[in-house]
Amino acid sequence: MNVALRRAYELERKGLEFYINSASKSNNALVKRTIFSLAKEEISHMMKIDEISSSLDASGKWIGEEIGFKGSDIEVEIRKFFEKTDKEILDASKDNTDLIKKAMEFEKKSYELYDDLSKKAGSDIEKRFYDELKKQEENHFDALQNVDYYLTETGDWFEKDESNVWSWMNS
């Protein structure tokens, strides 16, 4: 595995470990579902990194043009859970904001790593791959931020960029 992919893989592995450990500490159903959804996406990222690494090891080439992450839409998954779960359950035990903040920091570090790797990429396909991972980490951050807004019920919700706010949580 090349150095950049190894760094990416290790970061995703640490994220998975963090999310699995964090889920067991949460008493809030929304936080727990969000954390498990993020853990699932970390596994998806690790699998894609491993797939690319295997291709590089075997042929010295990045795999074809298909580098995206299929079915990776955390907002859709959280929305489905949110809409089918009683408000009492969603609002129970809103004490996990510190866990959410730590997760947001982790996603920010992930974004920064992929931004750096994208800038140092040796090919267009490698750059696109790291840019896609950056986008994924940004989506993860937005998910965590929206859950944090929901849990803390801060007025900050309305001051943020509308494109990042899940207004359906506030209805």
Regions found by a protein language model. Give the residues of each.
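Non-heme di-metal
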Residues: 1-171
